[in-house]
Amino acid sequence: MLDEKMHKAISIIQFKLEGQLIEKHPEFHMEDRRLLHQMDLEKGTVVIEGVTYPLKDKCFPTIDPKNPYQLTAEENDVVERLKTAFVNCERLQKHVRFLLTKGSLYKVYNGNLLYHGCVPLNEDGTFTEVDIYGEKYSGKELYDVLEHYVRKGYYSLDKEEKKKGLDICLLYT
C-alpha cells in the first residue's frame, strides 16, 4: 500500500513538471500530454480529446485545481533533494559519462540500424518533421540534433544551452 502511495505521489510530481515544460515549449506540440488541467476533481472525471472519463482514484490532495501544474512546497523539496542526490552520486555520474562517451541515440551495426526510442513517422511511413527550438528536423538529422542537445544538457557550461539540453532530455525520454 505504501509503495502505491509513493508511486502515485512521484507520478503527480512528474506530470506537473512535464506539464510545465510542455507549456514552456509549445513548439514541441505535446499539449495533448497535459491532462491535470482537464481533471474535474469534484466530479472525479478527466476530459481526453473531448471525451469525459471517470477517474479510478479521486484523491489528489496536492493538485490545486486553479493551478494544477504548480508543485507544492513539499513536492518542490522532494524534487530538490532528488536532484541533489543525482548530481552528487559519483557512481551515477560515472555511468552517465560512460554512456555519453561510448553511447549514442543510434548506431549502424552489421548493416542494421539500432536506435533508442521511437522514430516519428507520418501516416505514409515518411519521417515526420519535428520542431526543435525553431528549426525542423527529421530522420537521422533529428536524432543527431537530439543527441547534440543531450550532450549540451550534461556538459555545457553555458546556463541557457544547458537548460535547453536538459529540457530536451526530459521531454524526449
Per-region residue spans from a language model:
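Feature recognizes metal-dependent phosphohydrolase scaffolds
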Residues: M1-L171
